[in-house]
């Protein structure tokens, strides 16, 4: 997942920049 993807996709891939 990248930072442009939906937060639930980012969080499961541990993208902290999306978790905010």
UniProtKB/Swiss-Prot annotation:
One of its GO terms (molecular function) is toxin activity. The keyword Chloroplast does not apply. It is found in: Secreted. Expressed by the venom gland. Keywords: Secreted, Toxin. GO terms for cellular component: extracellular region. The keyword Secreted applies. Its main location: secreted. Spider venom toxin that exhibits cytolytic activity by forming an alpha-helix across the membrane. Lethal to insect larvae. Belongs to the spider toxin CSTX family. This is Toxin CpTx-4a.
């Amino acid at each position: 997942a990248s930072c442009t993807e939906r937060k639930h996709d980012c969080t499961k891939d541990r993208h902290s920049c999306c978790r905010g």
